[in-house]
């Protein structure tokens, strides 16, 4: 497939508001692609350059894109930055500038989908002193040979921000329709493989294999998530439940196979080098090959420390030994996804728990199994007294559903008025904060993963955190116009609020009353932020409409 055809399909989809129509467009194209092209096409459509389980990064930000584009159009970098600041949509700006470029190429090569992918892989593997220069040259090559429309989507791919309305659900529907595979089999394969490109490849080449895929060591899968709820309603609905402490820690997934160990964050980024002590503890605690779900907490004088304490360890790239002495970590494990090569996610939670206890000789999280709301309530208050956030309630017959935030796991906390949102923009501050970002624009996501603005937040951010946030965001700036700065949307805030209100001022149709910054959620991926569906559910519960 020529890349221009890919760009034309993207353009068609971008102008399509119907989810079903988008799935139909993809389902029509999937069978026409070669076995090598299909997984690349699927990933690119979602703005992904690598499988979801991979922690590989392109290492290419907005600043390098500005430099590459300036070279291609024969203008100064400041001209490019000004154009982007005035327009905002970086893809469409690149399209426009390539269309108007003065430095016309006497010859150009047609871009092929697989050649573009090979360039991206080469950029990701660049290392050493000249790595940025090598990435820049690759970007210059791609943009120099691009048509204006190709340039729009190349730029978005380089920043891994496609945003054309192709979410996981749309791709799964398209795979099912294109190759006649039942949707539940596609869903199960995606849960185990965590790569829709590979799911599509198997559906095309050997659909029977989709029913027999397994979770594989060192290919992390998404973690099962929880909704908010109440003890009473859970007991009334399910009867006997498992209650566990809800730790104020950092979620992890531990993999051990053939004597090798690795640990991954909630965002599926490997953090083995940052947490060697935790890896060693878990390695010693089992003689089995395992994939385990858990949470690591910081401890001082026998009591849990705040989440931000752990972040200081996880962020540490150097002098990890000194950090180990300063901050003591303790892992708790509470679920098991695979043991000795066998995938366990389809087993009921009660059976997975028994297997977990049989393969681990330490660090298994304490648990209460009860059908008494009063007993669970007492367990909840005891957990709070011990410095935890609250408790988790889990349905004993539930499978492990990677990436699913359903009603099988429920979190019980004193405050239910916090929400995870992604930062999309900021306003420069005033007075002594003039060189810092003063307020931040926040967004939730719709069913396709497209971002919808819902609130601004400035309250609750002290000077120290403002400095931290400036350092975090300064290299993520995409555009700047007046006092408004637009960012790559990949930083998540946990935000408190007094009330959720309906509003026409924001794209989501809701607004937060008295929003306040609670904490930075480095451990969370943008895919985990609040959805429009869950906001609607929150609003209904708040107003007792359910």
From Swiss-Prot:
Database matches in InterPro entries: ATP-dep_DNA_ligase, DNA_ligae_ATP-dep_bac/arc, DNA_ligase_ATP-dep, DNA_ligase_ATP-dep_C, DNA_ligase_ATP-dep_cent, DNA_ligase_ATP-dep_N, DNA_ligase_N_sf, NA-bd_OB-fold
Catalytic center residues: 246 (n6-amp-lysine intermediate)
Reactions that this protein is recorded to catalyse: ATP + (deoxyribonucleotide)n-3'-hydroxyl + 5'-phospho-(deoxyribonucleotide)m = (deoxyribonucleotide)n+m + AMP + diphosphate
Tagged with keyword Cell division: yes
Keyword Lyase: no
GO molecular function: ATP binding; DNA binding; DNA ligase (ATP) activity; metal ion binding
Keywords: ATP-binding, Cell cycle, Cell division, DNA damage, DNA recombination, DNA repair, DNA replication, Ligase, Magnesium, Metal-binding, Nucleotide-binding
Positions of ATP binding: 244, 251, 266, 295, 334, 405, 411
UniProt superkingdom: Archaea
EC number: 6.5.1.1
Cofactor(s) named in the record: Mg(2+)
CDD domains associated with the record: Adenylation_DNA_ligase_Arch_LigB (cd07901), OBF_DNA_ligase_Arch_LigB (cd07972)
PROSITE patterns linked to this entry: DNA_LIGASE_A3 (PS50160)
Record's function text: DNA ligase that seals nicks in double-stranded DNA during DNA replication, DNA recombination and DNA repair.
PANTHER family: DNA LIGASE, DNA LIGASE 1/3 FAMILY MEMBER
Name of protein: DNA ligase
Species: Methanocorpusculum labreanum (strain ATCC 43576 / DSM 4855 / Z)
Gene: lig
